[in-house]
Amino acid sequence: MMKGQIAGLMKQAQQMQENMKKAQEQLALIEVEGVSGAGLVKVVMTCKNDVKRVSIDPSLLAEGEDKDLLEDLIAAAFNDAVRKAEATTQEKMGSLTSGLGGMAGMLPPGFKLPF
């Protein structure tokens, strides 16, 4: 490889690193909502998996309501939020990995980036 090509790759890697840092900061601000029980339970979390709110419809807290059902609905809403956060993260970060250009061929087969 020529000296200029190496310098170009290093500059490209540094720019990508800066872009990834900015994207990760943005992901910490993006909120997704997981829902279960036709909207009776909602979980709002960031794409960095920080739970911000849990909302439970008052009808689920009424006397005689099934505790196990409520627990299942909370778990389902949480899992829904996690899936949405992962999908959003992949979408946002995917544009960065497509910018690898010539560096993509340097990664080992099967190598996965940490996001």
From Swiss-Prot:
GO terms for molecular function: DNA binding. GO terms for cellular component: bacterial nucleoid; cytosol. Keywords: Cytoplasm, DNA-binding. It comes from the Bacteria. Gene3D superfamilies: Nucleoid-associated protein YbaB-like domain. NCBIfam families: DNA_YbaB_EbfC. PANTHER family: NUCLEOID-ASSOCIATED PROTEIN YBAB. This is Nucleoid-associated protein Rpic_1036. It comes from Ralstonia pickettii (strain 12J).
